[in-house]
Structure formats: C-alpha cells, structure tokens
C-alpha cells in the first residue's frame, strides 16, 4: 500500500507534534502540507526545515496550493470555532477530515473502544486529550458492570496548553462529558480539566471515577489492565499510577450526586493514570499532546487502510 499524503491545519503544539510523529513513525502516512496562520510560528518554521510544504494563510492558503491535490486526509488541530468552516471546505474538496478540536461535528473516536466503527465517516472527532486518556477506562469498567456515572479529572501542565486549548476549555468539558456517555457507555458523564502551573511542569495525570453496578472486582480490575495495555500499544507512556481502588456504597450511606437523579448505591471504582509524552516536540511532561496525536495518527492509519481496501475491490 502506498503512503497517503496528509495535511495538518494548525501549526501549534498539537499540530507540530503530530507532524513529527507522522514523519518519524508512520509507515502509511506522508506529510504533504503544514498549515498555519502565523508566519512566525515555530511549527511552520520546523516544517519548512523538515522539507514540508507550508502556508501561513490558513485553510484558504491550503486550498490554493498545488500540493493539496495529492492530499487525501486532513487533520484539523486549530480550534472548535474554526473547525466548522475548515471541515466544510475540506469535505467539499473530496478529502477526509480528522478533527482534533472539541467541535465534534463527526462521530467520536477512541481507538481501543470504537476505532473500527467509524472508518467510513468523512469527518471523525478525536474528542480531547483528557477523553483519549480516560474514556477507555470508563469503557473497560462498563463492559463488566454498567456505569451509571463517570467523572474524569484531567490535569495537564500549563506550559503544554497553547492558545487553542485555552480558548476551548468550555468545549473541552462539554465534548468530553458527552463522549463519556456516547463512547464510554456511562449513563451520565462529567469532565473537569486543570491547567497546572507548577514549575517544573508536571506530567499529565488523570483520575477516573465510575459509579457502577456491583460486580466481580477482579473482573473489573482485569478489564482495566487489558484496556491499559491496548492504549500502551500506541502510547507507551500511558500507565496506571497506582492499583485500582474499589469502594462499596451501601444503602445506609448512599451518595447524592447533582448530576444523577436520586440516591446512588453500588460500587465506586477509582482509577489513577499518568501519561508521559514521547517528547517528539514538547518535553515528556506533555503527555496530553502525545495521547491526542497518537490516537489521531492511529485513526488516520486505519482510515488509510480502509481507503486502500476500497480502491482495490
């Protein structure tokens, strides 16, 4: 199978990290164009040094480039607000779109959970970095015991959050909360993001709480460990910070949760994660970049394989 050419819209932290991954790691994707809006951005400068065609004129500049004709897949690493127009123009040109913003125009994709179910969609959404780290865990619990409520807290180093991430905090929480339900399988979902200003910057850490039906704890633990191994297959720095914790919530002391109707009794599962980045662009503390761009590249590679299958049948 020949390599599929890709373009990346957004020359910030996420876009630049993704570009480096495609060039260093992918056997089926090839960089075609890096697109930005700031001619002085480090991402565009780095792309040019690495021999990638660039434009600082945004989506309009991309459409005007002769290299765009050979591009088959476009990644959008801009912002939720910019994605709608970007998607419309890219799809109108007959290309596939992978959305790394919280815009969520297309279906949510979490590779180890539903990565094979959306390969024919013209636009797929990668949820958020926090979603990519935590929703696999919610799904792992849910496949053993029905999750009534899933809550995740994603803590990332402030230095790893560029202007696009900062502008999309509300969209981050809304999109992640919805994906906890739609992909993770929880009846209700809640997401919280923390930008940690600590110096030196701390590694990405995520906490997952699931309130679920009472079930075999060992089966839940094993399901979580199996899921962690699946994520590690494309994000080696993804790991459990400590042992999975369980707590029985009895009828004598039921939980009152604003997001849920009535009282809750059952099993509380607590999972603590950390994500160490591969340091392709920002240092290893930026695991939030690594899990997002790794998931996007894995999804693009699966889409490329599906496109190849379609072309040969």
Swiss-Prot record:
Keywords: Aromatic hydrocarbons catabolism, NAD, Oxidoreductase, Plasmid. NAD(+) binds at residues 11-14, 160-168, 288. It comes from the Bacteria. The active site is at residue 129. Its EC number is 1.2.1.10. It catalyses: acetaldehyde + NAD(+) + CoA = acetyl-CoA + NADH + H(+). SUPFAM superfamilies: Glyceraldehyde-3-phosphate dehydrogenase-like, C-terminal domain (SSF55347), NAD(P)-binding Rossmann-fold domains (SSF51735). InterPro entries: Acetaldehyde_dehydrogenase (IPR003361), Acetylaldehyde_DH_C (IPR015426), NAD(P)-bd_dom_sf (IPR036291), Semialdehyde_DH_NAD-bd (IPR000534). It holds the Pfam family AcetDehyd-dimer. GO terms for biological process: catabolic process. One of its GO terms (molecular function) is NAD binding. NCBIfam families: ac_ald_DH_ac, PRK08300.1. Belongs to the acetaldehyde dehydrogenase family. HAMAP family: Ac_ald_DH_ac. This is Acetaldehyde dehydrogenase 3.
């Amino acid at each position: 199978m020949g390599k599929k050419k890709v373009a990346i819209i957004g020359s910030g932290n996420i876009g630049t990290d993704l570009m480096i991954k495609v060039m260093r790691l992918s056997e089926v994707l090839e960089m075609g164009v890096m697109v930005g809006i700031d001619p002085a951005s480090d991402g565009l400068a780095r792309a040019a040094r690495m021999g990638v065609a660039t434009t600082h004129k945004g989506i309009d500049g991309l459409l005007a480039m002769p290299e765009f004709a050979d591009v088959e897949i476009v990644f959008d690493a801009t912002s939720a607000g910019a994605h709608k127009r970007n998607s419309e123009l890219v799809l109108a040109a007959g290309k596939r779109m992978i959305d790394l913003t919280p815009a969520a125009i297309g279906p949510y994709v979490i590779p180890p959970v539903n990565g094979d179910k959306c390969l024919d969609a013209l636009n797929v959404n990668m949820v958020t970095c926090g979603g990519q780290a935590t929703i696999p865990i919610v799904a792992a619990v849910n496949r053993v015991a029905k999750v009534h409520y899933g809550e995740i807290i994603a803590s990332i180093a402030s230095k790893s959050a560029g202007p696009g991430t900062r502008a999309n905090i509300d969209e981050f929480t809304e999109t992640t909360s919805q994906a906890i339900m739609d992909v993770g399988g929880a009846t209700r979902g809640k997401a919280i993001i923390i930008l940690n200003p600590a110096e030196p910057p701390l590694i990405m850490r995520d906490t997952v709480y699931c309130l679920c039906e009472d079930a075999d704890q060992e089966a839940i633990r094993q399901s979580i460990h199996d899921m962690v191994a699946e994520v590690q297959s494309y994000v080696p720095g993804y790991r459990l910070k400590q042992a999975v914790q369980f707590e029985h919530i009895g009828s004598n002391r039921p939980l009152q949760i604003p997001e849920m109707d009535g009282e809750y009794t059952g099993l509380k599962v607590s999972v603590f994660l950390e994500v160490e980045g591969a340091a392709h662009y920002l240092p290893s503390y930026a695991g939030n970049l690594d899990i997002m761009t790794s998931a996007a590249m894995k999804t693009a590679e699966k889409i490329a394989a599906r496109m190849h299958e379609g072309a040969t049948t």
